[in-house]
From Swiss-Prot:
InterPro entries: MnmA-like, MnmA-like_C, MnmA-like_central, MnmA-like_central_sf, Rossmann-like_a/b/a_fold. It is an enzyme of class 2 (transferase). Transmembrane segments: none annotated. The active site is at residues 101, 199. Belongs to the MnmA/TRMU family. Disulfide bonds join 101-199. The gene is mnmA. This is tRNA-specific 2-thiouridylase MnmA. GO terms for cellular component: cytoplasm. It comes from Micrococcus luteus (strain ATCC 4698 / DSM 20030 / JCM 1464 / CCM 169 / CCUG 5858 / IAM 1056 / NBRC 3333 / NCIMB 9278 / NCTC 2665 / VKM Ac-2230) (Micrococcus lysodeikticus). ATP binds at residues 6-13, 32, 125. CDD domains: MnmA_TRMU-like.
């Protein structure tokens, strides 16, 4: 099989490519140049997609004896990931740029070009698995290593995309074994630290980065009843569940800290309240997609049992869900967790599971507060 190995410059993609070579595939390595911004290209940057990463990817391919290329996807990355990130914050939502990058760059733009060039599959270092289901159709599953599992950020993949995905690290029980294997193979990235930051905000200062791109203006901080408590420097720079950065001179009546409950960009307001008001008992999702064949209940709109994860490496909770159209007729999901969840924000991604299988995903549109709402209907 002709395989295009996406080489990030990290240890996972290097070992994944090595295993693809061992499996007898005709492997070609490619590194994606995603940004020309100085903050992400300087030597020693903490984000990914740096000049150092490109050099490490080249050295890994040289060690493996496979061809190496660099593809410039910076323009599409800027439009589909960076601009989208800014637009979501402007709308008062909390986006996941890694999810968007997988959806529109790594498994859309990259895969499309790979197929055009005659490749059969794209190989990455993601910790996830593609397995046949009972009917023979392909399904996305969690990896053997729960601590490193990345099936959440791959929940955007479709059945057609899964047919061209190769995840050689799927059954590896720990990251330590991947590093040990890299060292045995003589790969220079064996001890390279993982990247944890948003790649285009390597210093981690999301608020400062947004302030340079969004027209932030001071506005009121209010409680759920609308009483003004203080002033913020820009509503769009806040996210649900945030506590830091709230300039509130007046303490809460119970003396407990306040958290962001809601961001209202059109009114330029930030609504705050006690921690207990972050509890959510019903979620609606928009722009849903299925990672493989939909569950049978999707055709009828009936409730189905599942498990829910709403942030990368976050907890997975039992839930029920159903597919429903909104008032405009657009498809969506309604999700009810078995217990209230804390800190769910519009813009995050809700990924549904059944056992180890990823059923699919949707972007969270609304999250209903459990303490301020009426009981759910059946």
């Amino acid at each position: 099989m002709k395989v295009l190995a996406a080489m990030s410059g990290g240890v996972d993609s290097a070992v994944a490519a090595a295993r693809a070579v061992d499996a007898g595939h005709d492997v070609v390595g490619v590194h994606l140049a995603l940004s020309r911004m100085p903050g992400t290209l300087r030597t020693g940057s903490r984000g990914c997609c740096t000049i150092e990463d490109a050099s490490d990817a080249w050295r890994a391919c040289e060690r493996l004896g496979i061809p190496f290329y660099t593809w410039d996807f910076s323009e599409r990355f800027a439009e589909d990931v960076v601009d989208d990130f800014v637009a979501e914050y402007e709308a008062g939502r909390t986006p996941n740029p890694c999810m968007r990058c997988n959806e529109r760059i790594k498994f859309a733009a990259l895969l499309e070009r790979a197929l055009e060039l005659g490749f059969d599959a794209v190989c990455t270092g993601h910790y996830a698995a593609v397995r046949p289901g009972p009917d023979g159709s392909l399904e996305l599953h969690r990896a053997a290593d729960d601590a490193k599992d990345q099936s959440y950020v791959l929940g955007v993949l479709t059945a057609d995309q899964l047919a061209h995905c190769l995840f050689p690290l799927a059954d590896t029980p720990s990251k330590e074994l991947v590093r040990a294997e890299a060292a045995e193979r003589g790969l220079s990235v064996a001890a390279k630290p993982d990247s944890h930051d948003i790649c285009f905000i390597p210093d981690g200062d999301t608020r400062g980065w947004l302030a340079e791109r969004i027209d932030l203006a001071p506005g009121p901080i209010v409680d759920p009843e609308g009483q003004e408590l203080g002033t913020h420097a820009g509503a769009q720079a806040f996210t649900v569940g945030q506590r830091k950065g709230l300039a509130i001179g007046r303490p809460a009546p119970d003396g407990k800290p306040r958290f962001v409950l809601e961001v209202r960009p059109k009114e330029n307001k930030v609504v705050v309240g006690g921690r207990e008001l972050l509890d959510v008992d019903r979620i609606t999702g928009i722009r849903p997609s299925w990672a493989g064949a939909p569950v049978p209940e999707a055709r009828t709109g009936a409730w189905f049992d599942c498990a829910l994860q709403f942030r990368a490496h976050g907890e997975i909770v039992e839930a029920r869900a159903r597919q429903r159209a909104d008032a405009a007729g657009h498809p969506g999901w309604e999700i009810e967790p078995a217990r209230p969840l804390r800190g769910v924000a519009p813009g995050q991604t809700a990924v549904l599971y059944r056992g180890t299988r990823v059923l699919g995903q949707a972007t969270i549109d609304t999250a209903r507060n459990a303490r301020l709402s009426a009981p759910a209907d059946a």
